[in-house]
């Protein structure tokens, strides 16, 4: 299926003043209400990575799980879950980070990766880059490497994709929005 950026962007709903005043939240749930759009998004990532050399897909809590799991299934790659603090039952590694909303903690099971593994880290959106940089730090703490950071949406004005690139993390997104795009 050919990727149609316009069609995808029209299904990403802007929600002004959520979760706090001044923020325009990019709601991807309408993408999941359209089987065609969901397939288009998932297939775009699958086609990009089908021949790539990496060992795992790491998906961010919670919206990163939705597409990340499809990609992992289609590419036959192990899926590791990066969760918000307190959501994983076994031994974890934890990393603090800043979001556009404040400080948070990201966790992963400490036995998720081995030395030498290579991880595609995936989220729905790159804003400040905090979540993906925290995930990259956790990957590196397990002596693995980050293959690439990927997301559906980039908000370049918030600087996250640039921070990732400055940290030597290759970055890929399907589309971008200006902060004032409605």
From Swiss-Prot:
It is found in: Cytoplasm. It catalyses: AMP + diphosphate = 5-phospho-alpha-D-ribose 1-diphosphate + adenine. Pathway: Purine metabolism; AMP biosynthesis via salvage pathway; AMP from adenine: step 1/1. Its main location: cytoplasm. Keywords: Cytoplasm, Glycosyltransferase, Purine salvage, Transferase. One of its GO terms (biological process) is AMP salvage. One of its GO terms (cellular component) is cytosol. One of its GO terms (molecular function) is adenine phosphoribosyltransferase activity. SUPFAM superfamilies: PRTase-like. Its EC number is 2.4.2.7. Pfam families: Pribosyltran. Homodimer. Belongs to the purine/pyrimidine phosphoribosyltransferase family. Catalyzes a salvage reaction resulting in the formation of AMP, that is energically less costly than de novo synthesis. This is Adenine phosphoribosyltransferase. It comes from Ectopseudomonas mendocina (strain ymp). The lineage of its organism: Bacteria, Pseudomonadati, Pseudomonadota, Gammaproteobacteria, Pseudomonadales.
């Amino acid at each position: 299926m050919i990727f149609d950026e316009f069609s995808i962007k029209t299904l990403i709903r802007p929600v002004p003043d959520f979760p706090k005043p001044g923020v325009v939240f990019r709601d991807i749930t309408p993408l999941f209400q359209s089987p065609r759009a969901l397939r288009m998004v998932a297939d775009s990532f699958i086609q990009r990575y089908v021949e790539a050399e990496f060992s795992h897909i790491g998906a961010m809590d919670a919206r990163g799980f939705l597409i990340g799991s499809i990609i992992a299934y289609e590419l036959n790659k192990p899926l590791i879950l990066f969760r918000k603090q307190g959501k994983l039952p076994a031994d974890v590694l934890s990393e603090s980070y800043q979001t556009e909303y404040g400080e948070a903690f990201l966790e992963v099971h400490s036995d998720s990766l081995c030395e030498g593994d290579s991880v595609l880290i995936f989220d729905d959106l790159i804003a400040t880059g905090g979540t993906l940089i925290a995930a990259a730090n956790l990957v590196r703490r397990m002596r693995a490497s980050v293959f690439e950071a990927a997301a559906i949406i980039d908000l370049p004005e918030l600087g996250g994709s640039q921070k990732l690139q400055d940290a030597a993390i290759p970055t890929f997104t399907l589309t971008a929005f200006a902060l004032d795009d409605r």
